[in-house]
């Protein structure tokens, strides 16, 4: 996945208050803090600040906290949801964006309190109501996770 950003253009930012209008998730499960840039129908970059106050750290692992990989994947899926809404418009009152499948998930290094996750998700294709994306998560420019995701809006 290579996200190509045109030179001399202002990044498109979406703050958390707007993200909350796009996604139904709330604390403690809203895992996208800010969109730092995107291009409708193509790609999106977002961040998640990992703090020691995350509820998951009470059990994963109290003496040596590591942000769970499944939550990295969930945050990546939420980033695809923001891209889908930014591309296709707001969801209807009774509509949800479902995480349908995941393939080729790989975890490269642990994520710990104090890290800032940067997600890059890219639209691949849409077929019969299922949208396929590829995603990567980075900390300090180093790959921590990658996966192919499928989501459905119903």
From Swiss-Prot:
Pfam families: FabA (PF07977). One of its GO terms (cellular component) is cytoplasm. Its EC number is 4.2.1.59. The active site is at residue 60. It is found in: Cytoplasm. It is an enzyme of class 4 (lyase). Its main location: cytoplasm. One of its GO terms (molecular function) is (3R)-hydroxyacyl-[acyl-carrier-protein] dehydratase activity. GO terms for biological process: fatty acid biosynthetic process; lipid A biosynthetic process. It catalyses: a (3R)-hydroxyacyl-[ACP] = a (2E)-enoyl-[ACP] + H2O. CDD domains: FabZ. Disulfide bonds: none annotated. Keywords: Cytoplasm, Lipid A biosynthesis, Lipid biosynthesis, Lipid metabolism, Lyase. NCBIfam families: fabZ, PRK00006.1. Belongs to the thioester dehydratase family. FabZ subfamily. Involved in unsaturated fatty acids biosynthesis. Catalyzes the dehydration of short chain beta-hydroxyacyl-ACPs and long chain saturated and unsaturated beta-hydroxyacyl-ACPs. PANTHER family: 3-HYDROXYACYL-[ACYL-CARRIER-PROTEIN] DEHYDRATASE. This is 3-hydroxyacyl-[acyl-carrier-protein] dehydratase FabZ. It comes from Actinobacillus pleuropneumoniae serotype 5b (strain L20).
């Amino acid at each position: 996945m290579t996200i190509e950003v045109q030179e001399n253009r202002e990044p498109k930012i979406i703050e958390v208050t707007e993200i909350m209008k796009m996604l139904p998730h709330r604390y403690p499960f809203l895992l996208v803090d800010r969109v730092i840039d995107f291009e409708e129908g193509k790609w999106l970059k977002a961040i998640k600040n990992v703090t020691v106050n995350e509820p998951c750290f009470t059990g994963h692992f109290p003496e040596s906290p590591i942000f769970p990989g499944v939550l990295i994947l969930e945050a990546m899926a939420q980033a695809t949801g923001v891209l889908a809404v930014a591309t296709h418009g707001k969801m209807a009152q009774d509509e949800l964006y479902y995480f349908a499948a995941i393939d080729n998930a790989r975890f490269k290094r642990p994520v710990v309190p104090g890290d800032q996750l940067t997600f890059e998700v890219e639209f691949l294709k849409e077929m019969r109501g299922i949208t396929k994306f590829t995603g990567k998560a980075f900390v300090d420019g180093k790959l921590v996770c990658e996966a192919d995701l499928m989501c459905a809006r119903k």
